[in-house]
Regions:
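Nucleotidyltransferase catalytic core that binds NTPs
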Residues: 1-141
Length: 141
């Protein structure tokens, strides 16, 4: 009797200030794959209009590696770098936010099934940054 092949999935991002929303993304991702690869971007502000991460790459890598839903963490620098890595990736499914429906994303032309995460929550890194800022501001004033 042969063992069924494991379904490999992947998701990509900076995953700065890892929060409950990220956990829900990874948890949902594991419902559509057996092995989850997280592509971690070093600094998204390099080639896109995104915030520079607060946490260092090693900090984010250590946190991601410790999450029970994440099986593997791989690093990429730019969207071009990510595309090159995805071209050679042996995976079945890409997990991406529902806000990307109808939009072009890096690797949209590659032969991966796409699963749009539901995002049935209001957690976000931007909201967390603001909460921390307001809490620190309140302590000082």
């Amino acid at each position: 009797m042969t063992t069924p092949a494991k379904k490999v999935g992947f998701t990509c991002g900076a995953f700065d200030l890892c929060h409950a929303g990220h956990m829900l993304v990874f948890k949902e991702a594991k419902t559509v794959c057996d092995h989850l690869i997280v592509f971690l971007q070093d600094d998204p502000s390099i080639d896109r209009a995104k915030n520079k991460p607060v946490m260092s790459l090693p900090e984010r890598q250590i946190i991601l590696a410790g999450i029970k839903y994440v099986d593997e963490v791989r690093i990429y620098t730019t969207e071009v770098d990510l595309y090159e890595k995805l071209k050679n990736l042996k995976a079945d499914i890409r997990i991406i936010g529902a806000d990307w429906k109808g939009k072009q994303f890096t690797g949209h032309d590659l032969p991966f099934e796409v699963y749009y995460n539901s995002r049935s929550h209001n957690f976000s890194t931007s909201a967390l940054r603001e909460r921390v800022y307001l809490a620190e501001y309140a302590k000082r004033h």
